[in-house]
């Protein structure tokens, strides 16, 4: 997909290549990433944050495309092919992954701050065990919320990842927080 940030336009393609172009469409840099880019990358504090279909999250230098860090985790044999974006707040990237995993990762270093499971995979077949987080996590005050396909919705504290509340509600579309004051 095409995405923009600052004065650059960038293109992610299915073959795992990411390119940066100037506003006058001159190539600035191109780089290989670990897999197919299925969502819009984000640019924060000079770092391009990109998710790939193989369950990895990469931080790239916005000026030259060089990889600064890589967060990776295993991917089950069967997943939902909807790859959620990430939410970024207070120098932390919040991302939902396959098998119901929600992770908080340092924007500057890629080091895991905390990880938790929103919904445990369960069932007797691979299809029944799909519990992927299929939408971007939602931030609200000091909590991050995520919902899993065939699973549950849950909210956690931003800082430590402590469970604040959860309900057995499944979704493949995501969640919205609405304050009814």
Where would I find each of the regions flagged by the language model?
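Tandem repeat domain/solenoid detector
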Residues: 55-56, 66
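Structural signature of WD-repeat beta-propellers
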Residues: 6, 13-14, 52-53, 97-98, ...
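Extracytoplasmic beta-rich repeat domains
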Residues: 1-3, 28-44, 67-90, 115-140, ...
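Post-signal-peptide, soluble extracytosolic/periplasmic N-terminal scaffold domains
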Residues: 1, 7-14, 20-22
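Short loop/turn segments that connect beta-strands within beta-propeller blades
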Residues: 22-26, 61-65, 106-110, 157-160
């Amino acid at each position: 997909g095409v995405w923009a940030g600052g004065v650059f336009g960038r293109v992610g393609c299915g073959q795992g290549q990411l390119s940066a172009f100037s506003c006058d469409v001159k190539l600035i840099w191109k780089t290989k990433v670990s897999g197919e880019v299925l969502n819009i990358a984000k640019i924060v504090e000079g770092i391009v944050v990109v998710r790939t279909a193989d369950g990895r999250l990469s931080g790239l230098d916005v000026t030259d495309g060089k990889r600064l860090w890589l967060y990776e985790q295993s991917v089950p044999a069967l997943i939902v092919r909807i790859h959620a974006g990430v939410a970024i707040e207070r120098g932390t990237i919040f991302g939902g992954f396959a098998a119901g995993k929600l992770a908080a990762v340092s924007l500057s270093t890629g080091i895991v701050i905390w990880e938790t499971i929103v919904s445990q995979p369960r069932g007797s077949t691979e299809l029944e065990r799909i519990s992927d987080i299929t939408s971007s996590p939602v931030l609200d005050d000091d909590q991050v919320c995520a919902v899993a396909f065939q699973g549950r919705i849950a909210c956690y504290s931003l800082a430590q990842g402590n469970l604040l509340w959860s309900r057995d509600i499944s979704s493949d579309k995501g969640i919205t927080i609405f304050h009814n004051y």
